[in-house]
Amino acid sequence: MFPLQLVVFPRTRLPLHIFEERYKQMVGNAIRDESEFGIVLARKDGIVNAGCTVKVEKVLEMYPDGRMDIMTRGERRFEIDGLNEEEDYLRAEVSFFDDDDAIAAPEEDREKAIRHYRTLNELGTARNHSEPDLQDPQLSFQLAQAVPDLDFLSVLLRQRSEAGRLKELIHYLSGYLPKQKAIERMKELAPTNGYGQKPEGL
């Protein structure tokens, strides 16, 4: 298991630079066995008890000292049942889960969420992320990867309804975007007197 300062979702892509010896071993095993490894959000007080597995899609570069650049793809969500710290890297017993229902989100919610996502990108405050698949039945995962709030993303990852996730995402962005627009406007006006003009010298 790989504790990181990020949240990954199913079917989203994540580039990683692997440099620690213990994770070189873990990723090397995953490449050799074509298996998954888990990514969980790391906090100052420990790790959250849910995450998502990834598979290595491609080794982008292998360095002479064993470091590597890889491209991974999110696979399955899980909850942690127990930890095993006997190996050099963290291992865990997990239970996999998916959505409890297959009810599609209303089309109007999908369209609104996409609009919010595009606005987030235009503001320049989006987290680095892979190109979203807007046809994904679990669209919320594709769009949420751009949100910079890791605590919110961790909650969203554990939500077991696509319709519910999309509503939570819309609600979050409906509050976040106006604040960011105001911040950007203040930055634009910072060198001026607030009216788009630079203050005159004394």
Located regions from the model:
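N-terminal low-complexity, acidic/polar interaction/targeting segments
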Residues: 1-202
